[in-house]
Amino acid sequence: MNLNTSSNTGDTQRLKIASLDVKQILKNETELDITDNLRKKLHWAKKEKLEITTKHNAELASYESQIAKLRSEVEKGEALRQSLEYDLAVARKEAGLGRRAAEERLAEAHRIQEKLCAQNSELQAKTNETEKAFQTSQQKWKEECRRFEHDLEERDNMIQNCNREYDLLMKEKSRLEKTLQEALEKHQREKNEMESHIRETALEEFRLQEEQWEAERRELQFIVQEQDTAVQNMHKKVEKLETEHMDCSDLLRRQTSELEFSTQREERLRKEFEATTLRVRKLEENIEAERAAHLESKFNSEIIQLRIRDLEGALQVEKASQAEAVADLEIIKNEFKEVESAYEREKHNAQESFAKLNLLEKEYFSKNKKLNEDIEEQKKVIIDLSKRLQYNEKSCSELQEELVMAKKHQAFLVETCENNVKELESILDSFTVSGQWTSGIHKDKDKPPSFSVVLERLRRTLTDYQNKLEDASNEEKACNELDSTKQKIDSHTKNIKELQDKLADVNKELSHLHTKCADREALISTLKVELQNVLHCWEKEKAQAAQSESELQKLSQAFHKDAEEKLTFLHTLYQHLVAGCVLIKQPEGMLDKFSWSELCAVLQENVDALIADLNRANEKIRHLEYICKNKSDTMRELQQTQEDTFTKVAEQIKAQESCWHRQKKELELQYSELFLEVQKRAQKFQEIAEKNMEKLNHIEKSHEQLVLENSHFKKLLSQTQREQMSLLAACALMAGALYPLYSRSCALSTQRDFLQEQVNTFELFKLEIRTLAQALSTVEEKKQEEAKMKKKTFKGLIRIFRKGVIAVLAANRLKILGQSCASLFTWMESFKEGIGMLVCTGEPQDKHKFPKHQKEQLRCLQALSWLTSSDLLAAIISSMAELQDVIGKADPNSRICGHLLIGAAKNSFAKLMDKISLVMECIPLHSSRSITYVEKDSLVQRLAHGLHKVNTLALKYGLRGHVPITKSTASLQKQILGFTQRLHAAEVERRSLRLEVTEFKRSVNEMKKELDKAQGLQMQLNEFKQSKLITHEKFESACEELNNALLREEQAQMLLNEQAQQLQELNYKLELHSSEEADKNQTLGEAVKSLSEAKMELRRKDQSLRQLNRHLTQLEQDKRRLEENIHDAESALRMAAKDKECVANHMRAVENTLHKVRDQISLSWSAASRNDFTLQLPKLHLETFAMEGLKGGPEVVACQAMIKSFMDVYQLASTRIMTLEKEMTSHRSHIAALKSELHTACLRENASLQSIGSRDHSNLSIPSRAPLPADTTGIGDFLPLKAELDTTYTFLKETFINTVPHALTSSHSSPVTMSANANRPTQIGL
C-alpha cells in the first residue's frame, strides 16, 4: 500500500509538472500566433492602403491629364476661331473688292451696250437713207425710160438707121437691170449679213463678258474651295481629336479589363480562402479576419465600381462636349455657307451674319465656361472621394483597435480557462477514481490504448463536435444577422447620401437664385440711379422751364405795357391829326399844306400792322403755353408710370423673396423630419447591436470551452502555418518577378505585331512604287530589262541552294529544341490572343528513346513528381527561413523594419533562385543563337555575306526582281518631271490658241472695215448711176471689187461659223457650269432654310433683350422730349426777339418818316406855289427837328414832346432788350452746358447699347411728334448751340444807310418807300 501511495504521489507530481509545462508552451504559442496574425493583418492593411493610394494617385494623374487635354483643346478651338474670324474678314474684303470689280464691269458692259445700241440705231438710219435713195433713183430711172420710149416712138422714122445701136442699148439696159437686181439682192444679203454680223458681234461681246463673269465665278469658287479645304483641315483636326478620345477610351477599356482580371484573381483567392476555411473551421479568429477582409474587398470593389461609374459619367460628359464641339463646327460650316451666299447678297445680309457670329462666339464662351464648371465639379467629386477614403482609413484604424481589445479580452479568457483547468485538476486530485484513470492513461502511453478508452475518446470527440457544430450554426446565424444589419445600415447611409446630394442641389439652386436676385437688385439699383439722375435732370430742366416761363411772362407783360403805351401814343397822334391841331407858321414850315387824310391813312396802316403783329405774338405765346402744359402733363404721366413699374417690380421681388423663404422653411422642416427618422433608426440599430453583443458574449462563453481542444490542433497548425507562410512569401516573390516579365513579353509581342504591320505596309509600298515605275517606264527600258533577265537567269540557282541550307538549319534547331524541352503546358490568356507562357518541369529527363505511350506516361509521372516534390518544398522552406524570422520580429511603426524586410526578401529570393537552378538543371538558360551570332565563321554569317554578294551582282547586272527603291523613286521623279513638262507644253499651246482667237477677232474687225468699204462702193455706184456716166470698164471693175468683197465675206462667214461652233461649245460648258451652280444654289437654299430656323431662335432670344431695352428707350424718349421742350423754348425766345426787332425797326421807320416831313417842310417852304407836297415819313432827323421845334406853335411843341417821349420810351425799350439779350446769352450758356451733359450721358448709353444692331432701333415704337420748325432739325446730333449775333444794331444801321439815298433822289418816290417800309415788318414778323 505504501508503495502504491508513493507511486501515486510521484505520478501526480509528474503530471502537475507536465501540465504546467504544457500550459507555458500553449501560452507562448498563442502569443506567437496572435502576434503573427496581427502582423499579417497589418501587412495586408498596409498593402491595401498602398494599393488604394497608388490607384488614387493614378486616377488623379489621369484626371489632371484629361483636364490639360481639354484645356489644350479649348485653346486650339479659340485659336481656330480667331483664324476663322481672320479668314472671314479676308474673305469679306475680297468679296467686297470682287463686288466692286463686278459692278464696275457691269457698268462698263452697260456703257458698251448703250454704245452698241447707238451704233445700231445709226446703222439703221443709214440703211433707211440708202433705201430711200435707191427708191428715188429707181423712180427717176423709170421716168427717164418712159421719156426715151416716147421719143423713140415719135422719131421711129428718123432713127431707123440707129436701130442697131438702140438694140445694143436695150441689151445693155437688160444687163444693167440684171446687175441692178443682183446688186439689190446682194445689198439685201449684205444688209442681212450686217445685221447678223452686228448681232453676232454683240453676242460675242456678251459671251466675252460671260467668260469674264465665269472667270470671276471660278475665282470665287477657288476661294470657296480654299475655305472648304480649311473646313476639311478642321474635320481632320476633329478626327485627330476623336482618335485621341478613342485612345483614351481604349485605355479605360484596358483599365476595366485589368480590373476584371483583378476581380478574377480576387475570386480565385476567395475560392482558395474558402477551401482553407473548410479545412480550418475551428479557427474563429481567422474566419472573422477573413470575413472582415472579404467585406473590405467588397467595399473596395464597390468603391472601384463607383469610380468606374464616375469615369463613365466623365466620358459621357466628354462625349457631350465633343458633340457640342461638332455642333459648333457644323454651325461654323453653315456660317461659311452663309458667307458664300453673302458674296451674291447685299451688305445688309453680311451685317446680319456678323451679328450671328458674335452671338455664336458668346455661346462658345458660355459653353467653355460650362465645361470649366463641369471640370471643377469633377474635382469636387474627387475631393469628396478622398475624404471618404480618409474616413474609411479611420474606420479601419478603429477596427484594428477593437481587434486589439478583443485579443486582450481573449488573453484574459485564456487565463481564466487555465485557472479553471487548475481547479479541475485539483478536483480530479481530490477524487481517487479520476486520478487512477488519468494515471492509467499516462502510464500506458507506451502501450497501445484499450478499446474502451478509444470508445470513450470517440464519444467525447463526437459530443464535442456536436457542440461545436451547434455553436458554429449559432455563429453563422449571428453573422447573417450582422450582414443584414450592415446591409440596412448601408442602405440608410446611401439614403442619407442621396438626401445630402439633394440638399446640395437645393443649396446650389438657392445660390443660383440668390445670384439672380443679386443681379436683378443690381440692375434695379442701376436703374434707380439712372432714374434719379433723369429726375434730377428733369427737375433742373423743369426749373429752367419755369424760369423761362416767368421770363416769358415778364417779357409779355413788358411787351403789353409797351404795346399799350404805343397804342395810347398812336391814339393821341391819331386824335391830334384828325383834330388838325398842328399850328405852324407859313414862313417857317409847310404843315398848312399837309393832307390830314394821308397822315391818318398811313398811321392807320401802321397801327393795323402793329395790332396784327401783337395778335400773332399772343397766339404764339398761347400756343407755347399750351405745348408747355401738355409736356408737363406727359412728364407727370411718365413719372407716374415709372413709379408704378418700380412699385410692381418691388412687389414682385418681395413676393419672390417670400416664396423663397417659404420654400427654405419647408425644406428645413423636411430635412429635420428626415434627421429625426435617421436618429430613430440609429437608436434601433444600437439596440440590435447590443443584442448582438449579448449573443457574442454567449459565443465567447462557448469559445472558452473550445480553447481547451484548440491546444492539440495548434501544434499541427504551427507547422502548416510556417509552411504556408514560407510558400506564400515564395509565391509572392515569384509572382512579383513573373508578372513584370510577362507584361514585358506582352508589350514586346504587341510591338512586334506593330512593327510587322509597318514592315508589311513598307513592302507593299515598295511593290506599288516598283509597279508604278515599271508601268510608267518606256518600251525601250522594258526591252533592255528583258534582255538582261535573259542573260542572268543562272543566279536563281544560287538562291534556291541558299533556301535549302536555311531550311536544313531550321530543322536541326527545331530538333534540338524538341529534345531539350521539358515543358508541361503553355498558358494562353482568353482576351490576349497570341501571348502565352511556357510552364516546365524541373526533374531531369532521360534521353533514351521511348515509344509514344511510354513517353506520355513518363511525362505524367514527371509532372506528378514535380508538383509533389519534397525537395522543392524543403528548398523553399529553407530559403524563406530568414524572411520569416524578419517578418516575425518586424514592427510596423519602426523605419528600420522596412530596410531589414527588403534585405531579407532579397537574400531569400537569391537562395531560392540558386536552389531552383540546382533543381531545374535540364532547362538551358542560354540559347544557342547568341553563340552562333557571336562566332565569326558561323553558318549564319556566311549566308549573310553570300546574300550580300548576290544582291550586289544583281544590282550590277540590273535584274528586275531586285531593283532598289532609290532607283524606282528616281525613275518616278523623272516621269513626274516629264509629265510636268508636258503640262507646261499644253499650257503654252493653250496660250497660243488664245492668241489665235484674238487674231481671229482682229480679222473679224478687218472684215467689218471691208464691209464698210463695200457699202461706200455701193454708194458710189448709186451716185454713178444717177450721173448716167456708167462705162463698161468701170462697171466690170466694180463687179470685180464686189466679187472680191463677196469672197472676203465668205471667208469671214467661214471664220464666223467656226467661232459660232466654238461659242456653242462654250455655251455647252456654261450650261454645265450653270447646272452645277443650280445644285450649289439648292444646297445654299437648304443652308438658308436652316439659317432661317436659327434666325427664328435668335429672334426669340432677341425678344427678351428687346423687352429689357424698351425701358431704356423710353428713358431716351423722355430725354429727347425734354430736349425738344428746351429747343421749343429757345425758338419761342428767338421769335420774341425777332418780333421785338421788327417793332424797333418799325418805330425807327416812324421816326425817319417824321424827320423826312420836317426836312420837306423846311426845304419846300419857298416853293409853296407848287402843289407837289407828299408825305415823306421815312426821312426824319431828331436833332434838326428839335432845333426847329422852338420856332413853331404849341402843336409843334406837343409833337416835339410826343416825339421825345416816344424816343425815351424807345430808349427804355432798347435798354430793356439789351438786358434781356444778356439774360438770353446767360440762359443759352446754361442750356449749352446742360446739352453737353446730356450729350455725354447719351454717348455713354449708346456705347453700352452698341452691341445691339441697328434693326433693334428701327423696330422701336417712336411716338408721333409735332412738326418742328426748320431751326430744330439738328436736335438729334446734340451739337452745341452757336451764339447768335446781335442783329438789332446792324439792322438799324443798314436801314439808316439805305434810307438816305432814297431821300436825295426825288420826292415822288416817297410813297413807294413808305409802303415798302410799312410792309417790311409784317414780312419779318411772319
From Swiss-Prot:
Task: From the UniProt entry, list the residue stretches annotated as the region Disordered.
Answer: 1306-1326
InterPro entries given for it? CCDC171 (IPR038820)
Q: Which UniProt keywords apply?
A: Coiled coil
Which sequence ranges form a coiled-coil region, renumbered to this chain?
Answer: 53-294, 323-391, 450-561, 597-630, 660-707, 765-792, 979-1143, 1217-1241
Q: Origin, by domain of life?
A: Eukaryota
Q: Does the keyword Coiled coil apply?
A: yes
**Under what name is this protein listed?**
Coiled-coil domain-containing protein 171
Source organism per UniProt: Homo sapiens (Human)
The taxonomic lineage of its organism, from the top, reads: Eukaryota, Metazoa, Chordata, Craniata, Vertebrata
Q: What gene name does this entry carry?
A: CCDC171
